[in-house]
Amino acid sequence: MSSIIFSAKDIFEQEFGREVRGYSKVEVDEFLDDVIKDYETYAALVKSLRQEIADLKEELARKPQVSSAPSPSHPDPIDVAASSSMTNFDILKRLNRLEKEVFGKQILDNPDL
């Protein structure tokens, strides 16, 4: 990561040589004033974010470590019921499709069934 070359003070105190056909001094000064304001804003933002990072790291260090994997000895009853009903529903759909394949022609040929 490269280091910061200029501070807001460096930009403010920068002197430029004068030439006959140069830029407007007023426009350059106004532009540099805006650049200085941006630098000050970025510096404050970086300081704030570094403090936030430090606070979050401290908070993380204080919290007990929790396992991310659920305990297999205590499955959630809602999850078990949902997966069971989905499995039953899937089985019924497959059974229906197989019956149509196997008995479909017989049902179409014999309308009494």
From Swiss-Prot:
It holds the Pfam family DivIVA. GO terms for biological process: cell division; regulation of cell shape. It is found in: Cytoplasm. The keyword Coiled coil applies. Residues 61-82 are annotated as: Disordered. Its main location: cytoplasm. Gene3D superfamilies: 6.10.250.660. One of its GO terms (cellular component) is cytoplasm. Residues 36-65 form a coiled coil. Belongs to the GpsB family. Forms polymers through the coiled coil domains. Interacts with PBP1, MreC and EzrA. This is Cell cycle protein GpsB. It comes from Streptococcus pneumoniae (strain Hungary19A-6). The gene is gpsB.
